[in-house]
Amino acid sequence: MTLGLVGRKLGMTRVFTEDGVSIPVTVIEVEANRVTQLKTLETDGYTAVQVTTGVKKASRLTKAEAGHFAKAEVEAGRGLWEFRLNDGEGADLTVGSELKVDIFADVKKADVTGISKGKGFAGVVKRWNFRTQDMTHGNSRSHRVPGSIGQNQSPGKVFKGKKMAGHLGCERVTVQSLDIVRVDVERNLLLIKGAVPGATNGDVIVKPAVKA
């Protein structure tokens, strides 16, 4: 199954097994995902389902967004997300139908995608885990510098992709094969073992693990 859900990261807590073992979990609230569009091979060149979740004020919508939601006869949500579908998957879906957390009832592991916390401008020690240079032995004010970043007149440039200081975080990150500890259908909650990318209240995409 490639179909996933969009949820909101509420934070972390822990649950206990029957043996008394403490398991750290991230709580993800998964409100009903409303189908806004079904993409087909004939019209779009690929098969996918587009969903929205949450609510958004009408005054905050662009005309294009308002028209798109009106055409689907779906309440405007806080964004649009798309899931590619395999052959034969999603045959029972229609525009306006809802996807809920119970689709994960039989799923053991999940891949979670989110926008990582932004850290601003960071040096190479924090950004790339470079080791620091000597604190003493004649080293003066070069404790956290990267060191050499190139060769000599040949090639006479710094190669693309060289690990250097720069902006850290605030990028799309996926953590794979996390255990699903509990699916709470009544409260629309997913409890996933360990940490997931993003800040509290950030949107996350939960899919069945591709490497399960």
From Swiss-Prot:
Residues 135-156 are annotated as: Disordered. Pfam families: Ribosomal_L3. InterPro entries: Ribosomal_uL3, Ribosomal_uL3_bac/org-type, Ribosomal_uL3_CS, Transl_B-barrel_sf. Keywords: Methylation, Ribonucleoprotein, Ribosomal protein, RNA-binding, rRNA-binding. Part of the 50S ribosomal subunit. Forms a cluster with proteins L14 and L19. Belongs to the universal ribosomal protein uL3 family. HAMAP family: Ribosomal_uL3_B. This is Large ribosomal subunit protein uL3. It comes from Tolumonas auensis (strain DSM 9187 / NBRC 110442 / TA 4). The gene is rplC.
